[in-house]
Structures are given as structure tokens and as C-alpha cells.
Curated annotation (Swiss-Prot):
A motif (Bipartite nuclear localization signal) lies at residues 455-471. Residues 193-355 form the JmjC domain. Keywords: DNA-binding, Metal-binding, Nucleus, Phosphoprotein, Repeat, Repressor, Transcription, Transcription regulation, Zinc, Zinc-finger. RAD53-dependent phosphorylated in response to DNA damage. The modification Phosphothreonine is found at residue 399. It comes from Saccharomyces cerevisiae (strain ATCC 204508 / S288c). The gene is RPH1. Residues 601-621, 654-669 have a biased composition (Polar residues). Residues 629-640, 670-686 have a biased composition (Basic and acidic residues). Residues 599-692, 774-796 are annotated as: Disordered. InterPro entries: JmjC_dom, JmjN, Znf_C2H2_sf, Znf_C2H2_type. This is DNA damage-responsive transcriptional repressor RPH1. The keyword Repressor applies.
Length: 796
């Protein structure tokens, strides 16, 4: 039901609805139809139709009356005056049944109106007996409740007189702090017939039905046993929920409500009246301790609606609608919270009082998801499999034909996404899609430059799928232009955390390195290459780095995708839109020439393997990055051992042979001959041409078998080039204008100099610097395998 239903009348600013049974039988739809009015007035009254009342078990059976238990009622100690009161609720450690509660009500009788005629009185009011002192269980049997069926309610004729009610209301506010009312509040239970499914407070259809647990009073009903003056203070419902209250029998309730438009004004007023409580807790009104008379509120420009709630009627409270009230006498009501769809955004930002241990907190996001998943009529977001492809293009899987006709980009999915049809991608859980989206926002490489265009594998589509999975090759023409090479990065392997360390070096493609490939490639014309999809794990990188250098006379192997692509994150050269992006913990280091980075890649050894077969390592000519010849890598079947040897400067072929000797010790015995002979050829080709170094010749001094690195600026000595680099950036960098007066170390900010001087270990001045011993790198065999240990510390 989406049609708006207007109220039958408005009483004291409160809309009153009198629905037909057809309107009334759908609770959720009817509440949505009247929601507009309740969100303005704070509360509404709903008078149920006669057809619904006929379904109730009236008068209530003895069994129903017997199960009513009022546990630990509260005594309300009220202090204050002039319309402002504070309520302290003290629990009474006793349980009453309904027979005892009615007997107790004789001690809480509303006063007689002195203006009423004496002959209108029906006799003196009887006092309570000792019945209330008996044990609520052992002293009563089913026969007692059967007899009580005819007297469980009271004479309500006095409460039909509006003048009488007005007198009692005024009397209540004048004498509120004279007595201590008793209220049987928050007692779990329900006395609605179990077979009643229409407007049964114990089982109202609403969003809270999808909560995983039952919370008393929230999605599990409470019984409220009232007596004269028993009050409920100004408050909002827990988590700003809706609530519904139904009086089963007895005296009426007086309700007050603040229109939602005045809620901020009301809160500010109460904050001013109770400053200490408001200071200690911003949600102090949720404590249900503060009362302000409607007269006082109206005098301060705050509208206050009021209405009388009679037996057999419903009152509904709304989010942001502050409400309060009291009972005119003995009665029994039932109440519970509920929620409509309109409440979801309200509940997400609702305040919560942390002063009360049992305050309610609902996971609204989880509740909304559970409700939408289980509600077939929900207008929420459709499932992912129902979304059209344009809505989420990342979830669209192109066909092989589409892939062949599309442009190759660094953000393109790998071949495995097209050929492995057993895998499914998810827009929620796939790290590939999320990372592709993140990186595409950082770098947007393009291939529109004519020097970067590639020819596609013409026979790719003709290859059977099983050939791709078996790493079979084909003869294809990949590149024709003799241009500088392009380095592309596969975001697939980055999503699989394979490229999380971008400082690892990349072996070059199109190299004559037999050890870097596991399988020889068939002889091909024009020296062209094809890169098939390996059948290794998903972490393999399917997009390899392609060179457009034609090297004649060299037999190539089909390289397989390495597990870890060892390359800085993105590097593109010889292009109008050059992109250089390096995400690394070393990104703060001073700039280093690309030639040095390229050479550093050759001095480190890496091994890539798959669960079933050995992954191959492929290399490519680095073009303008370096003109250095290839340096062999160990066979990937062997365990990987990093060497501490760094080629800083090649003075002569003798030094190169020493370097090769160290590398040959790291390699396996089976590869030693091939590895050494290969590097001997390299020495012959290079002759004595020195390698460009990061350090100047005067910065490196050979002392026996050790190298000492000397700073040209301050002549300080270091045991490793790494420490010298850090020293130059720290001390002699122009970016740090403030220096230490003792040691000369430089800082970006003056306060950093003070922190440096106040260290527990004082710095040493340049004049008193003493050279510390330098640890030598030693080669120690461990379990028959070469292992190089190096300890280096700065001399300062």
C-alpha cells in the first residue's frame, strides 16, 4: 500500500486514524501510508476497526491472566518544581501477578475532584488488603485467576469525562514530587492470542524481523503495568526506532510529544535546564530521567502535542519525536519497537548513550543487507549477476575475438582471463579488479604514439586452447619497426602481489641466455617471438616485456611468465608521454641514473618457479637504458642465493674475472663451466672498458680485499656504498639547510637539529671522528651451498 492515508481527525496536534479492516490488515503497508504525518507530529493514534477487536480473546482467559508477571517494578523518586523534574528509578526486588498488582493499585488512587457533587460519588474507595504480600505463585492457583476474569479491569467511566481528565492532569503536575509512584515497566511477555497475525504487537512484520537475535523491548515485546502517576520521561526510542504501544485493559495514558521540527529547540532547552547531565552525556535524554511540563515548554516557544490514550487503542511513536507521559491509574499495556525502510538512513546516524550498560545498538548496515536479501519485494540494489554489462565494465569478460581486435594497454586483463573460462571474476572480492581500478587512476599509459604500436599475433585465435595451456608456440610476426623498446607491466601479477617489490631487477628479453629458458623454441623466420599463456598458477604474469630489436643469428627460447616481474612499477621511454612511477620504500632516495639501475639488475640473482614446472626467465635489450652486455643468471632449478658482490667499477679484465668467480660459486656445479665460459666471452668483448659507477674513482679505496668508501666533502669513511649514499643525502643535500654544529649532519627543520643534539648518545664532531673497523665480506659454505654473509656498518 503506497497510497497516502489521511487522519480522521487531529486531537491536540496528534493525528488520529480510524482505518477500515482492509486498510488495517497490512501493518507494514499501513504504517508506510501514514508515515508522513507521524514524522511531523512525533506520535499518532490508531483506533483499530471492530473486526479486529472481535478476534481478540476477550475477556482474557484464566491461563492468559496467570502468565502475567510484573517483575522488579520501579519506584519513582521525583524531585523538582515549577514544571521541571528529575526522576530516579529504584527497582523493587519483588514479583507480582496481575491479581496482586490490582490489589496494590488501591494504594495509588487518583484524587476526587473537589468541585464534583457529593452525590455523584459511588462510595468510599476500598483499601488494599494483604493479598499483595502473598507469594505470587504458591499462593494462587488457576481457580483464583478464573474468578479474577470478571474483575481484572476497572470502571473506566470516569476517564471518559474530559473535564475529569483535565483535572487529573493538572493535579499530576502540581503534586508530582509529593509521592513515589510505582511502575511495572519493561517486563518481557505478551498476552495477544498466538493465532492473531494482524497487528499482533508480539509479531509485527517489519525490518527488525531480520535481526539475528531477539532483543527484549526492541524486537521482542514488553508488558507495562501502570498505576496512578507512573511516568515515562522525555526520551527518544533506542537507535531512533519507531515504537507501538497498545493498552490491553485499564486506565488511559496521557501522552505528550514534540513535533520533529522543534526537536533541536527542545533539546537545547533541556540542555540549559540540566547542564551537568548534558555535559557528561550528549544523549542524556535517553536516560529517561527528565520531565518538563507542557505548559513550561509552550512558555519557551516549544510546541507540545498532547492526547489521551485509551484502552484498546494503539499509539505509534516516530524517529526524532521526543515523547513523555504518565498513567491515570491501574492498567496493562504492551509495547515493542519496529522499523520501516525509511528508518534505515536514520538508524545509521542515530546517537547512542554509553552511560547505560544495556543501551541498544543495532548494526544497521548488516540489518539492511539481511532485509534486502530476504525481501523479494525490496527495491534495493539488484544482484551482481543481474547488472547490465555497461554498468560494470570490469565484470565483462570479452571473447577471444574481442581481445584480438582490442588495443593492448597496461591495464588490459591477461590472456588467462580469456582462455581460462572456469574462473569467474567478482566485482566485490577480486583483488585484480580493485587494483586495476586504483592503478588506472594513477597512471594512464597509452599506445597512440606511432613508435609504440605493435602488430598482433595473427595466428593467436587459430591456436587451440590446449596448445596455450601446454605452452606450445607458433610463428608470428610481433614487431617490425626498429625502434627503442617498450616496457609494459601486467597489472594481473601486481594484483596477485607478485610485483609488490618493484625494486627487483628485470632480466632482459631476446637474450642468448640459454639458462633463462626451460624449452628451446623452434627456428623462426625474421627472428620473431610468440609468448603463449603458461598453465601455471594465476600469479604468473602473462604479459611479457617485448623488444623490437632484431638480433640475427641468435636462437631464442619461448620465455615463460615469471612469478615475480622484476621491474620498477611503470617505466616508458621514447614516448611523448613519458611515465616513470616507482612505488618503493626506497622512493625517498636521491635520483640515480637509469644506466646504474639497469646494471644493478644484472648483479642480482633470482629464481622463478611454478608448482609443476620451472618458470623461465626472459630478457630484453634495454635500449637507451643501458648498452651493457648480458650477464648470465643461474639456472632457475637451483635455489636462489643473493650475492653481496656489487660491480662498482671494472678497472680491468682481472677484476671482472674475480667477480665472475664469486658468481660461479653461487651457481650449481652443473652450471659452473657454462656460466664461467660465458662470462669469459663477455670479458673479451668488453676488454678493459670501465663500467660507469655511482661513485667517483676517488670515493673508493681498495684496502687489501676490502673497499672503503670516502665522502669527498668531509672525508668521512664508510664500509659500504649504501651508507655513503645515505650520508651524502643526509649531510650534504641542499634540501636540508640546517646542520648540526658538532657533526655537520643536515636537517630540514631547526627543531630536528635540537632533537639531534639532545639524544642520549651525543654526536661526534668532525675533528674527533675515529675510523671504526670495517667488517669484511666472507664466503662461508653452508650445507654444501655457497652463502655470502656481509656485515657493514658506517664508520661515523
Amino acid at each position: 500500500m503506497t497510497k497516502l492515508i489521511a487522519p480522521s481527525e487531529i486531537v491536540g496536534g496528534v493525528p488520529v486514524f480510524k482505518p477500515t479492516y482492509e486498510q488495517f490488515e497490512d501493518f507494514y503497508a499501513y504504517c508506510k501510508a501514514i508515515n508522513k504525518y507521524g514524522m511531523k507530529s512525533g506520535v499518532v493514534k490508531v483506533i483499530p476497526p471492530k473486526e479486529w477487536k472481535d478476534k481478540l480473546d476477550l475477556p482474557y482467559s484464566a491461563e492468559t491472566l496467570q502468565k502475567i508477571k510484573i517483575k522488579s517494578p520501579i519506584q519513582q523518586h521525583i524531585s523538582g518544581n515549577k514544571g521541571l523534574f528529575m526522576v530516579q528509578n529504584v527497582e523493587k526486588n519483588k514479583t507480582y501477578n496481575i491479581i496482586q498488582w490490582k490489589d496494590l493499585s488501591k494504594d495509588y488512587v487518583p484524587p476526587e475532584d473537589p468541585k464534583a457533587r457529593r452525590n455523584s460519588r459511588k462510595g468510599s474507595v476500598s483499601k488494599s488488603t494483604k493479598l499483595k504480600l502473598k507469594n505470587f505463585e504458591s499462593s494462587f492457583n488457576i481457580d483464583d485467576f478464573e474468578q479474577f476474569r470478571t474483575e481484572y479491569t476497572i470502571d473506566l467511566s470516569d476517564f471518559q469525562n474530559t473535564e475529569r481528565l483535565k483535572f487529573l492532569e493538572e493535579y499530576y503536575w502540581k503534586t508530582l514530587n509529593f509521592t513515589t509512584p510505582m511502575y511495572g515497566a519493561d517486563t518481557p511477555g505478551s498476552i495477544f492470542p498466538e493465532g492473531l497475525n494482524v497487528w499482533n504487537v508480539a509479531k509485527l512484520p517489519n525490518i527488525l524481523d531480520h535481526m539475528e537475535t531477539k532483543v527484549p523491548g526492541v524486537n521482542d515485546s514488553y508488558l507495562y503495568a501502570g498505576l496512578w502517576k507512573a511516568s515515562f520521561s522525555w526520551h527518544l526510542e533506542d537507535q531512533d526506532l519507531y515504537s507501538i504501544n497498545y493498552i490491553h485493559f485499564g486506565a488511559p495514558k496521557q501522552w505528550y510529544s514534540i513535533p520533529q521540527e522543534d526537536r533541536f529547540k527542545f533539546y537545547k532547552f533541556m540542555q540549559e535546564q540540566f547542564p551537568e547531565e548534558a555535559k557528561n552525556c550528549p544523549e542524556f535524554l535517553r536516560h529517561k530521567m527528565f520531565l518538563a511540563s507542557p505548559k513550561l515548554l509552550q512558555e519557551n516557544g516549544i510546541r507540545c502535542n498532547e492526547i489521551v490514550h485509551h484502552e484498546g487503542e494503539f499509539m505509534i511513536t516516530y524517529p526524532y519525536g521526543y515523547h513523555a507521559g504518565f498513567n491515570y491509574g491501574y492498567n496493562l499495556a504492551e509495547s515493542v519497537n519496529f522499523a520501516l525502510e525509511e528508518w534505515l538512513p536514520i538508524g545509521k546516524k542515530a546517537g547512542k548513550c554509553h552511560c547505560i550498560s544495556d543501551s541498544v545498538e543495532i548494526d544497521v548496515k548488516k540489518l539492511a543487507k539481511s532485509w534486502r536479501d530476504n525481501n523479494k519485494e525490496s527495491k534495493g540494489t539488484p544482484p551482481l549477476n543481474q547488472l547490465p554489462n555497461p554498468a560494470m565494465p570490469l565484470l565483462h569478460r570479452p571473447t577471444l575475438k574481442e581481445m584480438e581486435s582490442s588495443s593492448l594497454r597496461s591495464t588490459s586483463p591477461d590472456v588467462g582471463h580469456f582462455s581460462n573460462f572456469k574462473s569467474k571474476s567478482s566485482g566485490v572480492s577480486s583483488p585484480l579488479l580493485s587494483r586495476m581500478k586504483d592503478y588506472s587512476n594513477i597512471v594512464e599509459p597509452t599506445l597512440e604514439d606511432p613508435t609504440l604500436k605493435l602488430k598482433r599475433i595473427s595466428s593467436f585465435q587459430e591456436q587451440p586452447l590446449n596448445k596455450l595451456l601446454k605452452r606450445e608456440t607458433s610463428q608470428t610476426a610481433m614487431l617490425t619497426d626498429h625502434e627503442d623498446n617498450i616496457v609494459a607491466m601486467s597489472l594481473t601479477s601486481m594484483a596477485n602481489s607478485a610485483a609488490s617489490s618493484p625494486r627487483l631487477p628485470l632480466s632482459r628479453l631476446n637474450s642468448s641466455n640459454e639458462l633463462s629458458n626451460a624449452q628451446p623454441l623452434l627456428d623462426m623466420t625474421n627472428n620473431t617471438l610468440a609468448f603463449p599463456r603458461p598453465n601455471g598458477p594465476s600469479g604468473l604474469n602473462p604479459l611479457l616485456y617485448i623488444s623490437n630489436k632484431n638480433i640475427s643469428g641468435i636462437s631464442h627460447s619461448a620465455p615463460h611468465s615469471p612469478v615475480n616481474p622484476n621491474i620498477s612499477l611503470i617505466k616508458r621511454v621514447k614516448s611523448p608521454n613519458i611515465v616513470t612511477l616507482n612505488i618503493s620504500r626506497e622512493s625517498s632516495r636521491s635520483p640515480i641514473a637509469l644506466n646504474y639501475e639497469a646494471r644493478q639488475q644484472h648483479s642480482q640473482q633470482h629464481s622463478f618457479s611454478t608448482p609443476s614446472t620451472v618458470s623461465n626467465l626472459s630478457t630484453s635489450v634495454l635500449g637507451p637504458l643501458s648498452d651493457t652486455n648480458d650477464i648470465k643468471t643461474p639456472h632457475p632449478e637451483r635455489p636462489n642465493h643473493k650475492t653481496a658482490n656489487r660491480i662498482l667499477k671494472k678497472e680491468s679484465p682481472v677484476e671482472t674475472s674475480k667477480s665472475n668467480l664469486i658468481l660461479s660459486k653461487v651457481a650449481s656445479t652443473r652450471q659452473e663451466d657454462s656460466f664461467t665460459s660465458r662470462n669469459d666471452d663477455l670479458d673479451k668483448e668488453q676488454g678493459s672498458s670501465p663500467l660507469n659507477s655511482k661513485f667517483a674513482p676517488e670515493e673508493i679505496v681498495l684496502s687489501g680485499k676490502n673497499k672503503i668508501y670516502i665522502c669527498k666533502e668531509c672525508q668521512r669513511k664508510f664500509s659500504s656504498g649504501h651508507h655513503l649514499t645515505r650520508h651524502k643525502k643526509s649531510v650534504h643535500s641542499g634540501e636540508k639547510p640546517h646542520s648540526c654544529p658538532k657533526c655537520g649532519k643536515r636537517f630540514k627543520r631547526r627543531d630536528h637539529v635540537l632533537q639531534h643534539l639532545n639524544k642520549k648518545i651525543p654526536c661526534i664532531s668532525n675533528e674527533t671522528t675515529v675510523d671504526a673497523p670495517i667488517m669484511n665480506p666472507t664466503v662461508q659454505p653452508q650445507d654444501g651451498k655457497a652463502a655470502i654473509n656481509q656485515q657493514s656498518t658506517p664508520l661515523n
